[in-house]
Amino acid sequence: MTDLPASVRWQLWIVAFGFFMQSLDTTIVNTALPSMAKSLGESPLHMHMIIVSYVLTVAVMLPASGWLADRVGVRNIFFTAIVLFTAGSLFCAQASTLDQLVMARVLQGVGGAMMVPVGRLTVMKIVPRDQYMAAMTFVTLPGQVGPLLGPALGGVLVEYASWHWIFLINIPVGIVGAIATLCLMPNYTMQTRRFDLSGFLLLAAGMATLTLALDGQKGLGISPAWLAGLVAVGLCALLLYLWHARGNARALFSLNLFRNRTFSLGLGGSFAGRIGSGMLPFMTPVFLQIGLGFSPFHAGLMMIPMVLGSMGMKRIVVQVVNRFGYRRVLVASTLGLAAVSLLFMFSALAGWYYVLPLVLFLQGMINASRFSSMNTLTLKDLPDDLASSGNSLLSMVMQLSMSIGVTIAGLLLGLYGQQHMSLDAASTHQVFLYTYLSMAAIIALPALIFSRVPDDVGSNTVLRRRNRSGS
């Protein structure tokens, strides 16, 4: 990339900083949840809404981000994304109640939803095609470093300053990024088709209401009548979208996608699989601090092996899938992740703390193999005219399923805890034991979906698809 103009290299740095801010925020909050609960006077069982509000907002807003960038311009939207994310961070740091913090996280999520996809679009527009892969590798590297630094940095800030600083550190970076975006980034626009606003609103309503209904009485304290109303609104919104999209060439997501069996299996497996995977990054630091008495910094350090395992596995996952095929890899990794989550729990309760980093490293490896395999399985057989729509739908489903996973994890803690988390250690351990047993069952269930992947889904299509997309 050294032969690129200096202005383009600066633009790539701006995108890279955006990726770093967004990825750091996905992991830095988890370690701070128990401290936030104590500061805000809330039960730790209710703090999952801080994560759910952000991830669910990202899922809802993702379908609109690419269209907005093409219509309004990548510079304008990227600048807006950074400003919203930074303002949301400031409001998070100033929040004095859980409700205020959740609302600030929603604002942060709107910015985060636009930052990464618009950043990818920017790279596509400013870099020659033959250097696109090298440029994307450069800008996504900080996005891989963010999850690695997040847990430990969050633990340090909570232990030696306060939880407010996990949000305040975004502000100087955001200000510099916003100014640099205005000064250095070109405002590319494209001719766009009409945005499917009706479909977008129906899907957004369906996702938001059903996820909130899942939290229900335990987390939100709503009455059974309101709960039934949320479920009814959510189901009606999704059914109306199906009716709206049927035969509609301008639908947000074409129903023709689901005529492809591989896509349907991959998307269903990705949705179910990421529900289970989404529970673990939330539950692990909470269990380490509340269940085992780890400090926030120590709990954050324990999360690093999981990220390292994930990064290491990404280097060999293509060879593994090519050797064993999608079905074997996905079924084995799904059941393996359930087993490893139980191994982590029993090792921790037995006091074998020296084993935990190795178990978390293995968990990260298995998770990475699942994610990469699920992504390629879902998209690899789509025709070119549906590839973009399928990729957008997969991105939305990934975020939605993660928010549902965190919601279910919080629901399980509340169900087994019954507000008794402050009792003796044996009772607390029992609460987490039952929660992890339930989580392991949920994690294992997608193996039933992946077992239906046919044998003729050839392993060599992974590399063939990669070469085709990179040519």
Swiss-Prot record:
Keywords: Cell inner membrane, Cell membrane, Membrane, Transmembrane, Transmembrane helix, Transport
Gene Ontology MF, one: transmembrane transporter activity
First-listed, main subcellular location of the protein, grouped into a coarse class: membrane
GO cellular component: plasma membrane
Membrane topology field: Multi-pass membrane protein
A Pfam family: MFS_1
Coiled coil: none
Highest taxon, organism lineage: Bacteria
Subcellular location: Cell inner membrane
TM helices/strands, residue ranges: 12-32, 49-69, 77-97, 102-124, 138-158, 165-185, 195-215, 220-240, 263-283, 286-306, 329-351, 393-413, 431-451
Record family assignment: Belongs to the major facilitator superfamily. TCR/Tet family.
Protein name: Putative multidrug resistance protein MdtD
Organism for this UniProt entry: Klebsiella pneumoniae subsp. pneumoniae (strain ATCC 700721 / MGH 78578)
Name of the gene this protein is made from: mdtD
